[in-house]
Every structure is written in C-alpha cells, then in structure tokens.
Regions:
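AAA+ P-loop NTPase catalytic core and its hallmark functional loops
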Residues: 1-120
Length: 120
C-alpha cells in the first residue's frame, strides 16, 4: 500500500484503489460487561489456523450494537471499518465507487467492507 495525500491506496489489476480510513472514535462501554466478553470470546483464536466466529448482533436501533463492536475492536487493538446499511443501500455501495476527480479522471474508492477485506 502507498501513502498518498493522507489516504492509503492499493493497486489491483493496474487500478489504483483509494481505501477507506478506519474509524477513530473512542466510545466507552458502560454496563453489560458480559455481552462485551461474549463478543471478544467469539473473536479469540488459539492458533493461526483457527478462524474467529462471526457473531450476529441484532436488536432495535439505538441499543448499542455499533458501540459494542467499536469497543470490542478497541480492546483488541484492531482497526475498525464501519458501513451503515440503510434501506436505500445498493449492492455497488458495498464494493467500489467510481468518483470523478477534480482532474477529470475517474478515481475508485473502496467501501469500508472492501478496505477491511484488503487489510485483513
């Protein structure tokens, strides 16, 4: 990956892809420590060959699902990429968005999902 004007890029099949920046919010988790422990336990691995579990966190809006994920990522010292899906989210929004740059050229911007897959 290259550092270019404060944004990271990578080249895939000759196309430069601008990567999303990780979330830098530092939320605080208050109460329900057991729920946080359960999410952290899902992501534990014993060896490099292990794959972590993928917990599905469901619930009504505003109950702290995103905050839980943010705090868990902070505890693990891992970068966090957030994508808020809405009713008008299109499949292409989840992948790469072509953007007309000031120079008149098209630049390609990876979604948070694609960036996290590239970064591992």
């Amino acid at each position: 990956m290259n550092q270019h004007s404060h944004s990271k890029t990578t080249v895939i099949d000759g196309i430069t892809l601008n990567l999303s920046k990780p979330d830098t919010t530092n939320p605080e988790w208050i109460g329900q420590s057991e729920v946080l422990k359960q999410v952290l336990a899902c992501w534990m691995v014993i060896s490099d060959k292990d794959l972590p579990l993928s917990p599905r966190i469901i619930g009504m809006p505003g109950i702290g699902k995103t905050t839980l994920g943010m705090v868990a990522a902070l505890e693990r010292k891992q970068p966090l990429y957030i994508y808020q899906c809405t009713s008008d989210t299109r499949p292409e929004d989840l992948i790469v968005t072509p953007v007309l740059a000031e120079s008149g050229k098209i630049s390609y911007h990876a979604s948070s999902l694609v960036t996290s897959m590239i970064n591992g």
